Amino acid sequence: MSVWNAVHLSRRFAALPQAFYTPVHPQPLQNVRWGMWNSRLAQQFGLPEAPNDELLLSLSGQQLPADFSPVAMKYAGHQFGVYNPDLGDGRGLLLAEMATKQGEVFDIHLKGAGLTPYSRMGDGRAVLRSSLREYLCSEAMAGLGIATTRALALMSSETPVYREREERGALLVRLAHTHVRFGHFEHFFYTDQHANLKLLADKVIEWHFPDCVQTSKPYAAWFSQVVERTALMIAQWQAYGFNHGVMNTDNMSILGETFDYGPFAFLDDYDPNFICNHSDYQGRYAFDQQPRIGLWNLSALAHALSPLIDKDDLEAALGSYSERLNLHFSRLMRAKLGLATQQEGDGELFADFFALLANNHTDYTRFLRELSCLDRQGNEAVIDLVLDREAAKTWLTRYLERAARELGQEGRPISTRERCQAMRQVNPKYILRNYLAQQAIEFAERGDFEEMQRLATVLASPYAEHPEFERYAKLPPEWGKKLEISCSS
């Protein structure tokens, strides 16, 4: 019996008019083999715990199940602030939709499937290096609790693919609640296809925002929720030190899920001006610019939705973005510092925290984790991370005095142990540092995916101690801090 018999598949996007996509059959790679199979994720859909030959043939595009209808989506987008009408799935195909056992629907998307009408000058392929990075980062983000697409499988091959050098071709099976991007709406707006613009909005609301249907202004209510989800996502990026790198509108999910992992990086040393994409010469997508770019992208989406939503409603939603993001960011940072209440002087304490880390090139994740462990170690473990020890002592003294004013149930002070236990649930011990990904890539390019599997296991539960994997918590070596990541993938 086919493994797909136990899975509920649908083709709702492929049922839309062909103005939305082009049907394309995947072009198989040579000698495809398994690299990674996300067993825990697979079982949520009724798929086998262990991968098999049928799954390999199905998901690599060699023998598609009858309920798969592969299509390349058409969209547009603003890339580095410049509108590009000629975008679309240039190497990825939406195969079908698949429901979990609880009825939650996800797209099945095959990245690296070959040429499509939207490939432009590309070859339609994905390389193992970038596919491995996307697999690991999407699962790391899920482990952190940040809204994201997911990775179901990674397959390698013997097909040569040429970027800066010859690399192995690969396939990534990506799952997402939707692959509809801001750029889908821009495409229909700028080509005056207002009927299709409305149809897409109607379907997105029906599928993903059903609570908006009964409101007096469904489209305005929906856009307000898109603003809210985007603000939350970017607040999470800032709180966890994640730099996306390519925040073009065609890389923005309409659901506020982190989408299209390219030259991303998590901060090592805290640097608000950090630029992870070495092709971003002007720093448009630098770490500290992400909140501003989120609003810019939402404004571009608002313009595309202007045939459906009154100007006043669009402006009201956009006007709420900064406050929403700041509220989410403040909540997240309070949790990371173990401060449940808002008290006088907190603004200065937070500002001085970020300044201390930036001025001393202190590792962001490590500092917060050590701060979360003061119930079982002395203050020196935190102070030792900072070059200016006196500045660190001064800030830490202020912080501990402030933390001591937190009250729990029945008005009693919260103990150091209670505070630190809560902080360890939101301050990860493990993140996907670029040097760790690079080491996994080097093993995988030799056909060894065990290092990647170990790393994926740790990143799935990054708040746990994992004493057997302590090496993955190490700070990067000097070469690891200087890795340059490009958009080539």
Swiss-Prot record:
It comes from Vibrio cholerae serotype O1 (strain ATCC 39315 / El Tor Inaba N16961). Its cofactor is Mg(2+); Mn(2+). It catalyses: L-seryl-[protein] + ATP = 3-O-(5'-adenylyl)-L-seryl-[protein] + diphosphate; L-threonyl-[protein] + ATP = 3-O-(5'-adenylyl)-L-threonyl-[protein] + diphosphate; L-tyrosyl-[protein] + ATP = O-(5'-adenylyl)-L-tyrosyl-[protein] + diphosphate; L-histidyl-[protein] + UTP = N(tele)-(5'-uridylyl)-L-histidyl-[protein] + diphosphate. The lineage of its organism: Bacteria, Pseudomonadati, Pseudomonadota, Gammaproteobacteria, Vibrionales. NCBIfam families: PRK00029.1. HAMAP family: YdiU_SelO. Mg(2+) binds at N251, D260. InterPro entries: SelO. This is Protein nucleotidyltransferase YdiU.
